[in-house]
């Protein structure tokens, strides 16, 4: 375990003892929950992060885009369930606060990931599904905000529909039937689904 919080003692584990999974970076699945453990949940080779910077124009999603750019340069990914960092949760962080316009940059980040993998159709398909899911989640989180409904809702709705079929295919492939049904409902009965979410 590494605790890198300022002023803390650093404790090292001599080796990782749990099972690890080695993945081909050219088959990375952006739709799995593990794909979203993003920048703070990864250890990188120097060769993968060289010349990559966090995007200044993104308030949310900059870490996901950073991870995508690193994976694009990698050949393999090793996934471990070991907790190697203490994660400090800041209740005032930008990701946990109420809606503001900067939250929409998460869609921009996912659009860039889809473009980044334009020449890798398998990976791009999962990125499209991830993008559609992010759009749907924005409506779930901020659908009660009048400001979101004015500023972000049209783009979130269009983004969801643009690649919702890829998302539903991924859900079926992964046997996530409950989520597939929820997505189908929102796909075919969007307006009723939004009103339901606003009433919750």
Outline where the language-model segments fall.
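Gram-positive cell-envelope targeting signals
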Residues: 52, 58, 74, 79-80, ...
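Catalytic core of nucleotide-sugar-dependent glycosyltransferases
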Residues: 82-91, 96-122, 137-138, 142-167
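Short, charged, amphipathic alpha-helical segments
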Residues: 124-132, 154
